[in-house]
């Protein structure tokens, strides 16, 4: 309805949104840093421990850094560090991941396939654990309930760690940090206000990603 003048969101999704929508810019001021982690059902501490141990290994091996650089690095780095699925035995079942693939660069569709930082990390975790990866795309607000009820094993959807969410699910160790920034209209560029406002609402407000 044209009433959205600014929105505070995480830096990397902000950059992706501005690149795709003319008439917007990111202010230079940064705000608080937020921790990103994956979510697992309460009572499934065994999976929490497995994922945390695997994340530590991937960090020590430089895999997490390379995945991040492939999507959010410098112009020279982006696209140069694609994660390559390992040829390993997958005898330990399937890890079902719940996500909302509308949050680039963490999860989004490309050529009909869900990709992004979170999905590459989940694939790397499965490679380490000898598991198949299955991705379930759903509404953002459905991911935590799906985790809690056992519909999926783990939620990977750019989740910030909050006390409110801790009441319902367990968080893994932090795998990424993101600074919050403000997107505003760039008055030097002509853009269709209503269209931008609707995109703000659909991408960042409707799903309550930051609560």
Which residue stretches match the model-derived regions?
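Short, Asp-centered acidic motifs that coordinate Mg2+ and/or phosphate
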Residues: 5-6, 25, 37, 96, ...
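Extracytoplasmic small-molecule ligand-binding "clamshell" domains
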Residues: 50, 66, 90-161, 166-167
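A conserved helix-loop-strand patch within extracytoplasmic ligand-binding domains
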Residues: 1, 43-45, 131, 160, ...
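Hydrophobic residues within well-ordered alpha-helices
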Residues: 1, 10, 38, 51, ...
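Short amphipathic alpha-helical coupling segments at ligand-binding clamshell hinges
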Residues: 10, 43-57, 63, 117, ...
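A ligand-binding cleft/hinge motif common to bilobed small-molecule-binding domains
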Residues: 4-32, 142-145, 157-168
């Amino acid at each position: 309805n044209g009433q959205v003048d600014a929105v505070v969101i995480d830096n990397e999704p902000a950059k992706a949104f501005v690149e795709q929508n003319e008439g917007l810019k990111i202010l230079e001021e940064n705000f608080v840093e937020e921790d990103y982690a994956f979510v697992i059902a309460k009572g499934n501490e065994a999976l929490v421990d497995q994922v945390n141990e695997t994340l530590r290994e991937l960090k020590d091996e430089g895999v997490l850094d390379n995945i991040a650089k492939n999507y959010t690095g410098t112009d020279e780095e982006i696209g140069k560090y694609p994660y390559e699925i390992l040829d390993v035995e997958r005898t330990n079942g399937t890890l079902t991941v719940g996500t909302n693939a509308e949050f680039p660069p963490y999860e989004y569709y490309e050529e009909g396939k869900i990709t992004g930082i979170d999905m590459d990390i989940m694939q790397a975790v499965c490679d380490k654990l000898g598991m198949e990866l299955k991705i379930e795309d759903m509404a953002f607000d459905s991911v935590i309930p799906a985790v809690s009820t056992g519909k999926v094993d783990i939620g990977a959807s750019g989740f910030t760690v909050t006390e409110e969410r801790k009441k319902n699910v367990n968080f893994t160790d932090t795998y990424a940090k993101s600074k919050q920034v403000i997107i505003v209209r760039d008055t030097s560029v002509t853009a269709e206000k209503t269209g931008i406002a609707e995109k703000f609402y659909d991408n960042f407000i409707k799903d309550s990603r930051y609560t």
